[in-house]
Swiss-Prot record:
Its cofactor is Mn(2+). It is found in: Cytoplasm. It comes from Pasteurella multocida (strain Pm70). This is 2-isopropylmalate synthase. Belongs to the alpha-IPM synthase/homocitrate synthase family. LeuA type 1 subfamily.
Amino acid sequence: MADNIIIFDTTLRDGEQALKASLTVKEKLQIAFALERLGVDVMEVGFPISSAGDFESVQTIARHIKHSRVCALSRAVDKDIDAAAEALKVAEAFRIHTFIATSALHVEAKLRRTFEDVVDMAINAVKRARNYTDDVEFSCEDAGRTGVDNICRIVEAAIKAGATTVNIPDTVGYCLPYQYGDIIANVMNRVPNIDKAIISVHCHNDLGMATANSLTAVQNGARQIECTINGIGERAGNTALEEVVMAIKTRQDMFNGLDTRINTQEIHRVSQMVSQLCNMPIQPNKAIVGSNAFAHSSGIHQDGMVKHKNTYEIMSPESIGLKKEKLNLTARSGRAAVKNHMSEMGYQESDYDLDKLYEAFLKLADKKGQVFDYDLEALAFIDMQQGDEDRLTLDVITSQCISHLPASAFVQVELDGKKMSQVSNGGNGPVDAVYNAILAITGLEMKMLNYNLTAKGEGAEALGQVDIVVEHEGRRFHGVGLATDIVESSARALIHAINAIYRSQKVADLKLHKIAGV
């Protein structure tokens, strides 16, 4: 039995199967390099027999990866195994993963075979794969719905034929943790040659049990977990790599000191890369890598966090590669959180009136939702009764985009009460053309860090909400725009961010005047 947990990543095989559009070879290689830096022990990167494109991507990754074992999938069919071996032969180290269904439903309805036939096919497949490599994994597809006697029988036969890893998948996410743990315990205790192989688990999340089942399996003797970044995969997805890795790291008391060799500080970066390349947004409340995973909004929680981080944080954001936790300022935040944000921006309590600031903050939070640091500064130092209206407002916007030609836009705004207009040509799409026009009017330089479009409602009357993050002079500003037209909502989001920049500049000017004694 292995001393540590082997992490078998299948983002580029099982994960990619769930995508609406296939990744390019270049994109797959980019993810493979990221997985190698992350420290996965094995990466399953494709199913070579399925297409020429998959064969090419497996071969390309196998040629370039040096520190992780590269694996390819094959059915228990000679031509599949031969194709996998051909694609993998250029690798530093490789594994052939062969599988066959074992549940009565699959054997009878899909394969139209007997279980005895399936055992023979498994033996032949493992032996053929061993002609190419001494690292062969065998999987019992739909083991979660296979009788334990049959699982033990075919696992014993596969190991005798040369399998070095035996995988017990909950292919359709059917098992509950106690059931799955019992299956693994039976394999551990009833298969006489189990000491010659590693038990692997591959869980799907149809009932939301993938992580729990994988961890229960480890407690019962499994030593390899098959998983994907962000849990992407067929239907409801696979076990999420980041969840099992951080659970084992955080709760080593429950796993007898077992660990993985994953460099956890790479988790956030790899998660974001996979999300972007696969065009699969991460839900905000996703464990470990969601944008809210280390965000605290409750006033009671924020007060506890200010006093001692461990009150509401069982692992640090730094442990997955984030800089720090976020104390989100909302209407539920207390004085302690507001004071803490001001302190982190370098302000002493004597610089402002906390009671007045908190009162103004609550009014803004009720209206706006989340309040950012630059909002807090404006509340603290700008008299809201004396002209804190937006300096920049949108009057007119038109744009034109013709195939194969640069986009153009006309924008008219009101800046400090004066109407100004600008024509922009040469934009990379209508939104870019509008942004170029607005920035030309304001003279501001900024970098777009994030642009996110979501639909509010359904049908022709749906609104498009654009959320952006821009960087200006080393500081980040947020903007939100809402309109039925995407170009207009994009323009309103940028104008919203620009007004935040203007308020921040006003605060800076007030501070300079105070220092100068003016």
